[in-house]
């Protein structure tokens, strides 16, 4: 079953895949990494002007990584805002997708956190560097195949 946004995108020849609806009735779409930036701009112009959240997760050990965007279409005089969830899957061997920082500025820290924890590179992000872990940290702590170091060093605890 396709939602209204999926039908709208299909009428305009924009490649995507409908993943159905979540428990709240929010439509979920899958977009290819190479199509993500252009579709993000189209969604912004269409009215999805608010990025509610961006996160990322490891689908399975040795499998794909996913970057997830929750967008809201806010219009004056409308009681119920439209929402959509966009998922962009990529191979862990080269996890790269275009940054949408220049579309929604609020992705700044969120894309940096996804980079820091999972190693997803967001091309054209202006400040893509670690935000939670020290710059010297090796590896991506939220990947399911991550092997945690067996030492803990507490510095300046008091």
UniProtKB/Swiss-Prot annotation:
It is a peripheral membrane protein. It catalyses: a plastoquinone + NADH + (n+1) H(+)(in) = a plastoquinol + NAD(+) + n H(+)(out); a plastoquinone + NADPH + (n+1) H(+)(in) = a plastoquinol + NADP(+) + n H(+)(out). One of its GO terms (molecular function) is NADH dehydrogenase (ubiquinone) activity. GO terms for cellular component: chloroplast thylakoid membrane. The keyword Chloroplast applies. It is an enzyme of class 7 (translocase). Keywords: Chloroplast, Membrane, NAD, NADP, Plastid, Plastoquinone, Quinone, Thylakoid, Translocase, Transport. It is found in: Plastid, Chloroplast thylakoid membrane. Gene3D superfamilies: NADH:ubiquinone oxidoreductase, 30kDa subunit. Pfam families: Complex1_30kDa (PF00329). PROSITE patterns: COMPLEX1_30K. It comes from the Eukaryota. Its main location: plastid. Transmembrane segments: none annotated. Belongs to the complex I 30 kDa subunit family. NDH shuttles electrons from NAD(P)H:plastoquinone, via FMN and iron-sulfur (Fe-S) centers, to quinones in the photosynthetic chain and possibly in a chloroplast respiratory chain. The immediate electron acceptor for the enzyme in this species is believed to be plastoquinone. Couples the redox reaction to proton translocation, and thus conserves the redox energy in a proton gradient. This is NAD(P)H-quinone oxidoreductase subunit J, chloroplastic. It comes from Arabis hirsuta.
């Amino acid at each position: 079953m396709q939602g209204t946004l999926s039908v709208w995108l299909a009428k305009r020849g924009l490649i995507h895949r409908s993943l159905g609806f979540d428990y709240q009735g929010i439509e979920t779409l899958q977009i290819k990494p190479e199509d993500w930036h252009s579709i993000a701009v189209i969604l912004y112009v269409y009215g999805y002007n608010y990025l509610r959240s961006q996160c990322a997760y490891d689908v399975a050990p040795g499998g794909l990584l996913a970057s997830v965007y929750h967008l809201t279409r806010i219009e004056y005089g409308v009681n119920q805002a439209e929402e959509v969830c966009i998922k962009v899957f990529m191979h862990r061997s080269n996890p790269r997708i275009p940054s949408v920082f220049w579309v929604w500025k609020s992705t700044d820290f969120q894309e940096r956190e996804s980079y820091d924890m999972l190693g997803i590179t967001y091309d054209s992000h202006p400040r893509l560097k670690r935000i939670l872990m020290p710059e010297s940290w090796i590896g991506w702590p939220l990947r399911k195949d991550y092997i945690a170091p067996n030492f803990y060093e507490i510095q300046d605890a008091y």
